[in-house]
């Protein structure tokens, strides 16, 4: 057993300053999460309850097994847009009758649960997670369909939702739809394409066209119940597989459906795991408020992995990247963590070899980001930084073992790609409130624009306006700073959530458990050409 030592001084001024800065960011984060939790606000929640209906989150609470956690995904979707934070949809992973399931629930207190462009992106991301990890899907449906004013952004890509349901079923991944209210127009295909559909007496309304549309199109007089009521679908159309008397009964029946899946995980759950030797609360004081100041990621690893036990790989080579093996909640993981921000040729080659080893051993990889990117300059260009960086990115792109990414600090430039950023399809990607991500840092980007503008003026023989340049740089820095912050990026679904660092071990443990529902198999020689 190789227990990581700690050099973290929790009594130092630096630790206190780091902790205070992160706690301030967590306070801001909690305020934004509260908006998602509030749904449509007190008025609309009260109206919903007044109709005898449960809020979406209470439906989920009844669905999942008692005293089991629910890992909510993308809670800040639509942050910074014209739509409500959360995008009128709740998604996450919960345990139902002992089975880990991907659960989605429309929030009818937000514009009747209507889908906007961010709702669609959030739902599609949930489907990706379900498919990659072979998680059965349960949809708690109550939606008026598409938000019509934004239909141009929803209609064409929105067809992928129904495609996904059928592909999940074809892959042998069960799908269940529980209809609590309206499921109209395109939304009618959610229960229609799911393996199992549960409907509620005098509540569920499932039809392609409601009475007004039918009247306009055919002249036929009809009402909700005869056209798409639960009893009609249970007795006449056959669309309803299960007929419930109320919401609680519908959820009970959904749980019984899952209990009869005869579902088995590809890998057995590991036994009890030893907790880290160090207090997870200390994670709050590790990342500096100024991301230009480096920190030792081993202090983070020591507070995440089982028993703080970590076997380093090539510890004396490419020291700006820490690599090694550990267990997290009993699951084996290979870890890559930035130590000094910049990636050089040595780090790139080290990473590529380590990723290949993980694929040989069928071990998932955890990437802990704090990088400004790959090194630039004449010496490094001549030394092959491009081909070595490409080697690392090649290895990440063609690796077949599951990847998990956590943005702790900076995640800039091609370093974001090499550390398995969103475009490289990590199974899950989370950010700490201390993180930032962009093509480069705000000051660097503003400086590059300034140099280019100055050179352009000189080439034309024109005087350069230094005052205007200072104003431009300040404006660009402010813009890039705002656009690199985690809430901005999370609002655009560039991560699966911004998390409290103290929750990281629990979140990663839940993700690893979900990942092991599906087979974990590495690439066997399936990498592209490595330039040597």
Residue ranges and their predicted role:
Residues 1-532:
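Ligand-binding clefts of soluble mixed alpha/beta catalytic domains
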């Amino acid at each position: 057993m190789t227990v990581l030592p700690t050099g973290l001084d929790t009594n130092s001024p630096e630790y206190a300053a780091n902790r205070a800065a992160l706690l301030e960011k967590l306070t801001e984060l909690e305020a934004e999460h509260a908006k998602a939790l509030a749904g449509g606000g007190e008025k609309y929640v009260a109206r919903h309850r007044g109709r005898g209906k449960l809020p979406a989150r209470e439906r989920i609470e009844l669905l999942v097994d008692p005293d089991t956690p629910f890992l909510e995904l993308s809670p800040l979707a639509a942050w910074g847009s014209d739509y409500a934070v959360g995008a009128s949809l709740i998604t996450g992973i919960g345990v139902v009758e002992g089975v880990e399931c991907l659960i989605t629930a429309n929030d009818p207190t937000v514009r009747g649960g209507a889908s906007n462009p961010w709702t669609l992106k959030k739902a599609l991301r949930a489907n990706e997670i379900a498919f990659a990890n072979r998680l059965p899907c349960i949809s708690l449906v109550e939606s008026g369909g598409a938000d019509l004013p934004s239909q141009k952004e929803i209609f064409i890509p929105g067809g992928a939702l129904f495609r996904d349901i059928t592909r999940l079923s074809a892959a042998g991944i069960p799908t269940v739809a529980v209809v609590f209210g309206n499921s109209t127009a395109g939304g009618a295909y959610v229960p229609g394409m799911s393996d199992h559909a549960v409907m509620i007496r005098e509540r569920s309304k499932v039809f392609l066209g409601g009475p007004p549309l039918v009247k306009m199109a055919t002249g036929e007089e009809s009402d909700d119940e005869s056209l798409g009521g639960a009893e009609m679908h249970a007795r006449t159309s056959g669309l309803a597989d299960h007929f419930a008397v109320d919401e609680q009964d519908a959820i009970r029946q959904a749980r019984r459906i899952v209990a009869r899946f005869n579902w088995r995980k590809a890998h057995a759950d590991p036994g009890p795991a030893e907790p880290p030797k160090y207090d997870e609360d200390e994670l709050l004081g590790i990342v500096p408020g100024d991301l230009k100041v480096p920190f030792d990621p081993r202090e983070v690893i020591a507070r995440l992995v089982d028993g703080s036990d970590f076997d380093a790989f090539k510890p004396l080579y490419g020291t700006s990247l820490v690599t090694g093996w550990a267990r997290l909640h009993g699951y084996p993981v290979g870890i890559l963590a930035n130590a000094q921000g910049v990636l050089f040729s040595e780090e790139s080659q080290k990473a590529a070899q380590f990723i290949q080893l993980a694929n040989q051993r069928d071990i998932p990889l955890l990437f802990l980001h704090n990088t400004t990117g790959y090194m630039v300059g004449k010496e490094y260009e001549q030394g092959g930084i491009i081909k070595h960086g490409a080697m690392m990115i090649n290895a990440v792109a063609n690796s077949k073992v599951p990847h998990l990414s956590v943005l702790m600090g900076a995640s800039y430039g091609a370093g974001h790609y090499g550390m398995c950023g969103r475009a490289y399809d990590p199974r899950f990607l989370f950010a700490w409130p201390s993180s930032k991500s962009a093509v480069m840092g705000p000051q660097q980007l503003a400086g590059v624009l300034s140099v280019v503008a100055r050179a352009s003026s000189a080439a034309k023989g024109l005087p350069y306006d230094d005052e205007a340049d200072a104003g431009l740089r300040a404006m660009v820095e402010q813009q890039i700073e705002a656009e690199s912050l985690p809430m901005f990026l999370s609002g655009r679904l560039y991560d699966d959530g911004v998390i409290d660092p103290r929750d990281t071990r629990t979140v990663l443990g839940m993700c690893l458990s979900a990942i092991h529902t599906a087979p974990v198999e590495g690439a066997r020689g399936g990498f592209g050409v490595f330039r040597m």
